[in-house]
Amino acid sequence: MGLLGRLFGRTSNNGDRAHAWRESWARAVEARDAAALAGLEAALRQTPPLADDLEIEEEMLDALRQLLDLERDLAAARLPLVDTTHRVVGADRCHFSAPVSMPDDPAQPTGRLLLTSSRAVFAGGSRTPAVPWHATREVLQRDRDLLFVRAGADEGYRFRCNSFADALCGAAIARHLMRSARKGLTHTPDS
């Protein structure tokens, strides 16, 4: 570590602690572990702090809270309903809508990712890629990115969300809709 780092109290230990916190957060997300919230919150409040600015970590913690709330609703077969008149939704029910970009597209268009009862669809840019749930092999989430992989393909569509909450909740809803389509369900009860 350099002289400036030592003078201003920056140590490699802070970087290690921040990395360890993010790994703990990722495990809590994967396990849907509500009990981990208190420990993650306490770790953010330690002195010295994990980082000079904890805004991203606080956003990640809030995203985990939102995901846990959503998972309770999904377990009870309650999907969120989003009122929209967007033409790409058509007669489908819309269960998620978030601003996204497509970082792998050369034009890097921005628009909205809409998760409907029958498909994931991007509204923005010059084209409107859509992936029907029955043709979706996998939904992956990493940081603020969502990747929808089509059945029979090695590639997919990557969407970059503006927040961790949108990425986590969008992935959870997409997986729920994908599983429902595989079971042959066209609509999940909205009670």
Could you say what each language-model-derived stretch is?
Residues 2-110:
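Anionic N-terminal interaction surfaces
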